[in-house]
Amino acid sequence: MVANFHIHDAEKYRVYEKGFFPILKKHGGSFHTVDDNSETLEGDDKREGRIVIFQFPNEEAARAWWADPDYQALSEHRRAGTQMKFLQLIHGMPPRG
C-alpha cells in the first residue's frame, strides 16, 4: 500500500496514527517507511505531503484491513485531519523460483 496525503490538523491525525499500528498488525501488515519530504526525480506528477508505505502478506489481508470496522471508525480521524491524494493497493510480484 502506498498513501500520499497532506496533514492539515495534526491533533486529529495523531489520534489516527496511534490507533493505526495495532490494526495493521491485526491483519499481518508491516510498516515500511514514512517521508514528509520525498523527491520526484523524474516525471511531471510531483508528489507533495506525506508518503507512507506499508504492506500485507496478500491482497486478501489488505482488503480485510480496509474493510475492518475498527479501521473504518479510526480512519474518520485521518479523513478529518488530512487531505488524501491517494491510498493505492499495489499488487506484489509472485514468488520467483
Which residues make up each language-model segment?
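C-terminal structural segments of small proteins and small subunits
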Residues: 62-63, 70-83
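Short S/T/G/P-rich N-terminal loop/turn motif that feeds into the first structured element of a domain
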Residues: 1-69, 91-97
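C-terminal end-helix/capping segment
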Residues: 79-97
